[in-house]
Amino acid sequence: MKLYKILGVNCFHINSVSDAKDFIKDLIVSENGGYSLAINAEKIMIYAKDSAFREIMDGSVLPIPDGSGATIGMKILYNIKSIKLDLPKTIFESANENNFSFFMLGATEKVN
């Protein structure tokens, strides 16, 4: 996976689910942690105006295209097509394939 910029916003080009799984595995094995961010047109526009939001977006270790604004932006700016990644499903599959375990925290005790 290669990192590109759309109007200054970091966004990975995701060529395949396999590439994403490899990236996720490497991220987990490295034990560095981090968070993902779904990049869409609204977030790209807010990025230019809100410095606190910009800092959050810049800190993402896995900014992925999510929505037509990001995917069309990559096509127009770089002439590449990025797949639409079902990130939760991909993380579950990667965890299963690599015998990783994880903990999910819900918003309330009832959903834990």
Regions from the language model: what does each represent?
Residues 70-112:
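Conserved beta-alpha
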Residues 1-88:
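N-terminal nucleotide/polyanion-binding subdomain common to many enzyme families
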